[in-house]
From Swiss-Prot:
This is S-protein homolog 22. It comes from Arabidopsis thaliana. GO terms for biological process: pollen tube growth; rejection of self pollen. Residues 1-21 form the signal peptide. The gene is SPH22. Belongs to the plant self-incompatibility (S1) protein family. It is found in: Secreted. Pfam families: Self-incomp_S1. Its main location: secreted.
């Protein structure tokens, strides 16, 4: 019974991340109708490449692994010439990672809910364009 209790507690903690949701959203908030090229990848998955139109977004919900080691790396490039770019870790462990591409950089807001919303509170600049 003792081992079952330990297993049940461990399993419950691991599954909590799946219930709370995991995902990436990338929103194009660039000016002058610029498009945004994006490509993200993890050890097991590739998202894109795709072009996000001005004002558009890319959203992907997924399950992270039981050990909490899921990582996604992303590369974003500003259109139309795609001369400014940035590569960065877009997801680690859990939660919803809400990224906003703006003229002066790339902003992040982490959400601990089950779905993305349109709130922009708690955004902070995480990356600058190269």
């Amino acid at each position: 019974m003792k081992y079952f209790t330990i297993f049940f507690i461990f399993f419950s903690l691991c599954m909590f991340g799946h219930v709370s949701g995991a995902g990436i959203r990338i929103v194009n908030e660039l000016k002058n109708k610029k498009t945004l090229w994006m490509r993200c990848y993890s050890k097991n998955d590739v998202l894109g490449p795709t072009i996000i139109p001005n004002g558009g977004q890319f959203t992907d919900y997924f399950f992270h692994n039981l050990f909490g080691t899921t990582r996604f790396m992303c590369t974003l490039k500003q259109g139309p010439g795609f001369s400014h770019s940035q590569s960065f870790r877009a997801f680690k462990n859990s939660g919803l990672w809400d990224w906003r591409a703006r003229e002066d950089g790339i902003y992040l807001r982490r959400i601990y809910k089950t779905k993305f919303d349109d709130d922009t509170d708690n955004l902070h600049k995480e990356q600058s364009w190269i």
